[in-house]
């Protein structure tokens, strides 16, 4: 039989990288939704893992599923929260790409959103529906792509520090269901892929 070469990436130098953290390679990293380090319940509800949901591993969604957990930015900290731990070599601007269920607002012009905080800073309200979006209309390119791909992609600009970072994701409207987070350093290009960038996790083995 023939031989098939297989390349295995080994990271030897990860100073200060916590055990089990997800780490960056060539300016990019991914984390599956269920791989949070902390799941903080709120008085109004909590996040739950939906096994085998979506394109890769699973999804996470807050319940009660009809609940809107906040409306104003100053209310975000009252919502259920997931915390993710990531490690990057270089401080700077990164694009956080959120892969979510293909949710539509309940009415035209409506809103679907969640909250995000980086390293304990003030959380921001992240709107998932772009201006001019019209669900159910073939002339709306954003809607048509979401239907074909069966996923919604939301891009958020974040500032990360060198080394360990904590990303907080807060429940918002009922339509928010997270499948994966990907981070891409400014100036880097994420290759096109149907399943997205695979995650890399440090182990002690």
Language model features by range: what are they?
Residues 1-205:
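Extracytoplasmic
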């Amino acid at each position: 039989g023939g031989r098939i070469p297989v390349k295995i990436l080994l990271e030897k130098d990860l100073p200060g990288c916590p055990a089990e953290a997800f780490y960056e390679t060539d300016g990019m990293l991914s984390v599956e939704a269920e791989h949070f380090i902390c799941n903080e319940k709120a008085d109004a509800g909590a996040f739950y893992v939906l096994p085998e949901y979506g394109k890769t591993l699973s999804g996470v969604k807050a319940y009660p599923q009809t609940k809107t957990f906040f409306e104003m930015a100053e209310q975000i900290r009252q919502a259920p929260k997931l915390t993710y731990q990531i490690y990057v070599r270089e401080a700077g601007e990164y694009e956080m790409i959120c892969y979510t269920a293909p949710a539509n607002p309940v009415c035209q012009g409506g809103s679907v959103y969640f909250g995000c905080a980086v390293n304990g800073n003030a959380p921001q309200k992240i709107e998932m529906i772009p201006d001019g979006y019209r669900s159910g209309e073939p002339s709306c390119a954003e809607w048509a792509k979401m239907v074909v791909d069966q996923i919604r992609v939301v891009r958020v600009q974040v500032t990360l520090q060198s080394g360990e970072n904590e990303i907080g994701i807060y429940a918002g409207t009922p339509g928010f269901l997270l499948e994966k987070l990907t981070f891409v350093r400014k100036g880097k290009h994420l290759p096109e892929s149907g399943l997205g960038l695979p995650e890399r996790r440090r182990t002690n083995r």
